Amino acid sequence: HLRPRRQRQMCIRDRELWRKILSMLFETGHPWITFKDACNLRSPQQHTGVIHSSNLCTEITLNTSNDEIAVCNLGSINIPNHLDAEGNLDKEKLEKNVTTAIRMLDNVIDINYYAVPQAENSNFKHRPIGMGIMGFQDALYIKKIPYASEAAVDFADESMELVSYMAINASSDLAKERGSYSSYEG
């Protein structure tokens, strides 16, 4: 039988703690900081509840309650695989793959294993999916664009705007086919 160790407690002034957090963030990239008020202000589903937290990487923020544990089904498009021989985005190929990925992410909701009923309830009620990109720096290398340049920012805007538009379009088409999710109205 092991006795739990008593952890030493200490007091730290709020400014000192804030400086320590910011120093660590600057030096290591951790801890990640997310402000709940900003998340709730910008949430497209304010009508469904309050965002209390994010996932570990803070890439998603979803509503939680006693009946719901936030779940998100995430996927990425590998941008370098969507560049043609001249280094331009192949928009037809990108649209085909984004559309397929959105359908697959929606299918994951139906075939997923849920360890707790609150996760299943949340996933079926909101059907949350997220699509991002990966390989951005590889794409810049292929395009011979320096990472810290205005051209890199422009390419980020172009590629993410296309992926976002195509994903929203694919999701809309899927809703016409399968119906909207139950918490959509609001």
Model-derived segments and spans:
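Single conserved hydrophobic/aromatic residue that forms the stacking wall/gate
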Residues: 1-12
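Active-site-proximal structural scaffolding
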Residues: 14-17, 26, 67-72, 98-101, ...
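Extended amphipathic alpha-helical segments enriched in small hydrophobics
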Residues: 127-146
